Amino acid sequence: MNNWSQGSTPQGSDPSPYAPELGSLPDGSQSDDHGDTVNKTGTTTIGITTDEGVVIATDMRASLGGRFVSNKNVQKVEQIHPTGALTLVGSVGGAQSFIRTLRAEVNLYESRRGEPMPIEALATLAGNFARGGPFRAINPILGGVDEEGSHVYSIDPAGGVMADDYTVTGSGMQLAYGLLEQEYEEGLSLEEAQSVAARAIESAVERDTGSGNGVFLAAVTGEGVDIQGHNDFDAVI
């Protein structure tokens, strides 16, 4: 079980908002001289709700400029709430800063009110920060469990927050969505959802150069968040 208040994040520097491998379409007018030197997660990240909890899956690759693999073991999902986790999509530095900020707000809320922040409120807060903060082009997935049930939200760089039964962000999203549309069905168990999510990540890494090297799976329940990394897809499919 991960310690949500002290989770580690991969190292990176301040991002460029222009990056072809981001989970959103880039605007060429925003490019600068750092596009090939800033670590970006490229990425395929997936969130699936079940009656038992939430499954979040990500690949493991970080790249420079979308052309050079700078890290093969990046943990792109982090615990930010006692029963909630967030993915890293976009520039590593911006995603790290976003996670640190949300963790601080979750801690502050709990210390003031004596109870965990509701996941819907956390999603709204994350959207506000994405729109108004200095985090630049990020497109994470938030998954969590509270008294209202299981929740998955995608958060776009403009601050839009969308709830769904399952969602995908990142450069491999079209490939992963193709498999999820076929495999997802209501009533999946947590274990079945993990297998579906892992297969969708595997489908994306076959063709998307920004995704690869394995899968991290996070199981989010009312008991907490458990994150495990797997270099071999066969171990979890």
Swiss-Prot record:
Propeptide: 1-42
Transmembrane domains' residue ranges: none
Activity regulation info: The formation of the proteasomal ATPase PAN-20S proteasome complex, via the docking of the C-termini of PAN into the intersubunit pockets in the alpha-rings, triggers opening of the gate for substrate entry. Interconversion between the open-gate and close-gate conformations leads to a dynamic regulation of the 20S proteasome proteolysis activity.
Regions of compositional bias (Polar residues) in chain numbering: 1-14
One GO-annotated biological process of the protein: proteasomal protein catabolic process
Family classification: Belongs to the peptidase T1B family.
Purpose: Component of the proteasome core, a large protease complex with broad specificity involved in protein degradation.
Protein name, per record: Proteasome subunit beta 2
Biological source species: Haloterrigena turkmenica (strain ATCC 51198 / DSM 5511 / JCM 9101 / NCIMB 13204 / VKM B-1734 / 4k) (Halococcus turkmenicus)
